Amino acid sequence: MGILEQLENPKFKATKSEKTLIEYIKSDLDNIIYKSISIIAKESGVGEATITRFTKKLGFNGFQDFKVTLAKEISNKKNTSIINLHVHRDESVTETANKMLKSSINILEQTVKQIDLDLMCKCRDLIMNAKRVYFIGIGYSGIAATDINYKFMRIGFTTVPVTDSHTMVIMSSITNDDDVIVAISNSGTTKEVIKTVKQAKENGTKIITLTEDSDNPLRKLSDYELTYTSAETIFETGSISSKIPQIFLLDLLYTEVIKEMFSEAVEKKIKTTSAILND
């Protein structure tokens, strides 16, 4: 029996809070799979723990597992593509492009609204005072880590991109309290990244995390947590909905650093550009 069938089944025994959650899910099926557990909890008025227990009651390992199955059901029911459940197989390129544009604008607007200005400044100062900065991430988050590492390196920072688990293990064993790790993971559940951060914290290394706004294990390990709302489903791993806020927040952090060290940053940028052109 599918999720939707279970929710409609009169024999399904639900608590008062679970009934509230069921009504919320049924009223927002088109968008529920794009929302984090924290957003659902806030909008439905039901606690995150209740949501987790409810999904396990339905036979799932947790909220993410629940969303995977629900996404499949909705996809099959609406005959839509699993690449993006708002994109239909038979629509024109223009329609798809406009949907993606609108989605990108909405994501950026949500990201800006969530920014904690004081926290961003603290992250900026932490990086500026660090001896070394490690940007770590696996998969698509690793791409974001590599991109921002290159930018900081161009203005004179000693930075290291770490995007594979083996190197992470080595790196985390030798970091110290002069170092900063910026750990990037959309879900905040990437095991390799979590393991690395735990080890580095034992060495006194300061941790900045960048994850979606959910009750995830990685952000709980951070000294400073930067979060964003991601509309990414399990089928959209690496989609624009997670990459846009990641890149935007990292670029904002980078820009804030440049503003503080403007003349020096410009000088270093000129030197590195010259070195590249003369290579």
Swiss-Prot record:
Domain named SIS: residues: 123-263
Gene Ontology biological process: carbohydrate derivative metabolic process
UniProt feature coiled coil, ranges: none
Keywords, comma-separated and alphabetical: DNA-binding, Transcription, Transcription regulation
Start-end of DNA-binding region: 37-56
Family matches, as InterPro entries: Homeodomain-like_sf, HTH_RpiR, RpiR-like, RpiR-like_SIS, SIS_dom, SIS_dom_sf, WH-like_DNA-bd_sf
Top-rank taxon: Bacteria
All residue ranges annotated as the HTH rpiR-type domain in the record: 1-77
CDD domains: SIS_RpiR (cd05013)
UniProt cross-references to Pfam families, sorted A to Z: HTH_6, SIS
Gene Ontology terms for molecular function: carbohydrate derivative binding; DNA binding; DNA-binding transcription factor activity
Protein's name in the database: Uncharacterized HTH-type transcriptional regulator CPE0189
Organism: Clostridium perfringens (strain 13 / Type A)
